[in-house]
Amino acid sequence: SLTGRDRGQLMLVVAEEGDFLLLANGRARRAENPKRKRRKHVSLQGPCDERTRLKLQSESRLTNSEIRKALALWTGDENAN
């Protein structure tokens, strides 16, 4: 996130709604209540792991635990679950 109270936080894009992205991190921003943010206020950092990508593409919802695990894998912090 580039702006707002969540500036600098790493989040996973869980869905898209036109010019908006729905972001979650599995803790403060949970899967059932993702943050709605304009694309221009978000810096895309890179792709997620294959398992997470396939689950998102299959239209099934990620759990908060799966979101935290995907972010931990991306940052290399295996103990951040």
What does each model-identified segment do?
Residues 1-16:
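Short, charged/polar N-terminal "headpieces" of proteins
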Residues 12-81:
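Ferredoxin-like alpha/beta domains used as RNA- or RNAP-binding modules
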